[in-house]
Structures are given as C-alpha cells and as structure tokens.
Amino acid sequence: MNINFSDVLVLGGISVSFLLAYQAIYFYFIYSPRAKKLGCALPPVFFSFPLGIPEVIRLVNAWFNDDLLEYFTFKFEEFQRKTGFQSVAGQLWIGTIEPENIKTMLATSFKDYSLGFRYEAMYGLLGNGIFTLSGEGWKHSRALLRPQFSREQVSHLESMRTHINMLINNHFKGGKVVDAQVLFHNLTIDTATEFLFGESTNTLDPALAQHGFPGPKGLVTGEQFAEAFTSALELLSVRVMAGAAWFLVWTPKFWRSCKVCHNFIDYFVFKALATPMEKDQEADRYVFIRELTKETSDPRVIRDQALNILLAGRDTTAALLSFTTYYLGAYPEVYDELREAVIADFGKEDAEPPTFEQLKQCKVLQNVIREVLRLHPNVPLNFREAITDTKFPTGGGPNGDQPVFVPKGQKVFYATYVMQRNEGLWGPDSTTFRPDRWNESREAIASGWDYIPFNGGPRICLGQQFALTEASYTLVRICQEFSRIEVLHPDVITSRNVMKQRMRLTNSSSGGVIAKFIR
C-alpha cells in the first residue's frame, strides 16, 4: 500500500479539525451548561489556534531563554483578570493568581485536588515521598515526617555553624569575586546532608569533599553525589513541565544520576538500620535518618523521604540566600541598616550561635527575608488536578466576581510569583524591593493568602523553619564579617528590567550571583 505526502496532509488536517471541533464542542456544549447549572460563570478564555500549539512554542521558547516567569506575568496581563482559561497542546488549563481561589484549592477544598501527573513525572528520583504523593499516602508521609521538624530539631545551630564559617573563611574572605549562588548551593547541601544523615557531603571543603562513601560500584564522594543530584533535578523539572507528556522526557544520564543518588543515600539508610537502638540513644545530636528508623524499618520508605526532604532543604534555602545577597548588594542602604541591626543584636563576633528566638526577634533581618520571599517565592509556579467536580469562589462573569466551575480532571496552575508581584494586591511599588513595607500592619500589606512563599494549607512546607533559620544565621554571619557586598548585576535582563530567572522545580538567577564580600 502506497501512501503519498498529500494523503498524510489530508489525514493530518482531518485529525486537527476533529480535535478542534471536539475542544469547541466540549467547552461550549458540555462545560458551559454544567457550569451554568451549578451557578458558575466563565472566566476569560484564550484559545491558541490550532490546538494550543503556538502556546506550546511560546512556553518552550520561554523555558530555554529563562523567561518562563515573565511569560506567566504576561499571560495574566493578557487575561486582565486573576483567573482565566488557556488552551495548551489541545488541553484547556485554568490559571489563577486570585488569593481566594488559591486558598480554596490549597485549604478549604483541599481534598478536591491531587498533584496529578507530578507523581509519575518525579517518581524516578523521589519515589513515594511527601512531595510526590497525594491522598492517604501523603497523609502517612506527613505524619511520619512532622515530628522530625519540631522547633527543637530545626533550631540547633551548632551543626550549621561549621559549614557557614567554612563558606565565609574559605570562600568569601580575601576580596575574591565568587558566584555566591553556587556556593550557597554547596552550603545548603552540606548542612542538609549533616541534618539528614549525620555526615556531610562537605562540598565547601575541597579536601573533605573527596572523601568517599561506600557504594555498590566503589566509593562515591560527596561532590559526585551533589553533581548527580543537580543533574537529576534538572531533567526532573523538564519532566514536570512536560505535563502529561512527561514519559517522553528521559535520558540515560538521568537514570545514571538517579542511581548514584539512590546508592549514596542507601549507604546511610542501611547504616542507620544496623545501628543498635541502645547505641543510637547514646548519640549526642539529632540525626533525621536515625530518628526515622524508629518509625519504620523499610529502607525504601526512609530513602524516598530523605530524598524528598533533601530536595527542599537544598534548593529553596540556596535560592533565598542567593536572591538576598543580590538585593543587599544592589541596595547598600538596606545592607547598612541590616548590618547595624545585626551588630546591635548579636555583636561583631561569632562568640556563639544565636538562638532560634533571637533570630526571629531581629525585625530588620526578618523584614529583608520576607521581602525577598515575596519577590522570589521558593516555588514560583505550581499545579493541581481536580479529582472531583468542584469550583472556585471567584473569577467568572463579566466582573470576575462569580464562581468558576472546575470539573473532575481539570488541570490548574497557580503562579505565586505573579500573585506576590501583582499591583492590584501589593500596590504601585509591587515589583520594588522594599523591606520596610513589612513594618506596616499585616492587614495593610496583604490579606494572608496573597503571600504564600512556602505554599499553604495542609501541604505547607514542613521544613520552612529549618530554611528560615539557616538563612537567618548565614546572613547574621555575613553581616558580622563584611562591611558591604558588591554585586556584579547579571548581564541578561528581561524587557521589564527584571533579573532573568531560571525556573525549574525551584527558582534561581540565570546569571548566577557574582559578588565580592568586602571586610
């Protein structure tokens, strides 16, 4: 049977026409009547002809040019609302930056939503962990992990102190120009692995970073593990962004990197499981993985949960410290005010680590951190999928004040980054770094659900106090040691004069944070 090119074109045209017709029929003759019956109204709807393919091209282009967050900013400007429909690759997505809708999805109607395709997309590296599971599996994970993040555990700063001082003494001192973003990632993986496993990767110390940990194919160094973890996360983020087509995204390097990560962590898991309980009780410091073995003896469960926590413990805190350094260099008057407050509260010397409560009481320090997290939330973009027919309280109708129908299977994205910079919510200086806005009353600044840097509702980040404590202590030590920070601004700036940001699972600066710390 011979098939010529014209036959293929005809067949393709028929297929596209069929899919277009199906999409239109579904929306106008199935979705709309059901919405009306439930007292809901339509939000703005944007079809990208044909089948949302042009929108896919724009998304891919934004991804490769590190313009993804600007793309979503533009998208909501196009909606001219805080909620709207967008056609992407033949699917209709609901996008929202409306605080009440996000509150409904994350809290009020939490049980109506799941993570959707995210489980399958992330399973290869993270397995059955708190960031991949929904429903009963997620509940079990949270119950297992919550006791491990009590204030007593996360406020012990002595173990962080060694690594923070290593960063300052070996890398920041001497007036060297460094990429602070890279070094903060090294710091946070060193502190996270010490908290989780009782032994650090020590990537900030060139000598100790070459220390090998036993694996099935020989020794794996902390440096090799850190590289494999970074490599695996890079492709993992592509799989998540690919949505329902996640299974098309894989490479041999991804699976090799996952294997290195699994083998590295298995060493600590089996070591903890083999430690007699009475000997473990004699240990003078808290180790996450040892405590977890008291709750379960399943090595796969322990490994998966440890990997999930490592993901949160490394990238989010590193991003917070990186963006904070950038702003403190760009706004020297803010750094001067912060340094003055730190020296007044903690002195010029690192005599002993401050307490958790002392860090929280340093108002200028906390204002700086809050403002950085407003402009650069840890997870700028997130997704959910409705597992039952439900609705948003607002966003529909000509004035955007009527409910919006969210049918079972509907995919939703919410852009925390866009919401926390929205002028309608935060005022005319919404994109300006201004920490003193947090001196105003909370009600005057925001309503509550328009500021969710660590997410919200039952899935709010368990490790947020760990991240805030580490970031706060690191900034205190920087202020104690250095009179100013010089930052070479990234060469690549967007059309809106905003720093280009590399959006993956979390967020980072495209050009790094090239800085010099002056004593």
UniProtKB/Swiss-Prot annotation:
Gene, per the UniProt record: cyp52E3
Record PROSITE patterns: CYTOCHROME_P450
Free-text function comment from the UniProt entry: Catalyzes the terminal (at the omega-position) hydroxylation of a fatty acid. Probably involved in alkane metabolism. Has minor activity toward myristic acid, palmitic acid, palmitoleic acid and oleic acid.
Residues binding heme, per UniProt: 461
A Gene Ontology term for the protein's cellular component: membrane
GO molecular function list: heme binding; iron ion binding; long-chain fatty acid omega-hydroxylase activity
Keywords: Heme, Iron, Membrane, Metal-binding, Monooxygenase, Oxidoreductase, Transmembrane, Transmembrane helix
Secretion signal span: none
InterPro entries membership: Cyt_P450 (IPR001128), Cyt_P450_CS (IPR017972), Cyt_P450_E_CYP52_ascomycetes (IPR002974), Cyt_P450_E_CYP52_fungi (IPR047146), Cyt_P450_E_grp-II (IPR002402), Cyt_P450_sf (IPR036396)
EC numbers for this chain: 1.14.14.80
Cofactor(s) required for function per UniProt: heme
Protein induction: Up-regulated when grown on alkanes as sole carbon source.
The organism's place on the tree of life at top rank: Eukaryota
Protein name: Cytochrome P450 52-E3
Entry similarity comment: Belongs to the cytochrome P450 family.
Enzyme class, UniProt record, top EC level: oxidoreductase
Subcellular location: Membrane
Membrane topology: Single-pass membrane protein
Catalyzed chemical reaction(s): an omega-methyl-long-chain fatty acid + reduced [NADPH--hemoprotein reductase] + O2 = an omega-hydroxy-long-chain fatty acid + oxidized [NADPH--hemoprotein reductase] + H2O + H(+); (9Z)-octadecenoate + reduced [NADPH--hemoprotein reductase] + O2 = 18-hydroxy-(9Z)-octadecenoate + oxidized [NADPH--hemoprotein reductase] + H2O + H(+); hexadecanoate + reduced [NADPH--hemoprotein reductase] + O2 = 16-hydroxyhexadecanoate + oxidized [NADPH--hemoprotein reductase] + H2O + H(+); (9Z)-hexadecenoate + reduced [NADPH--hemoprotein reductase] + O2 = (9Z)-16-hydroxyhexadec-9-enoate + oxidized [NADPH--hemoprotein reductase] + H2O + H(+)
UniProt-listed PANTHER family: P450, PUTATIVE (EUROFUNG)-RELATED
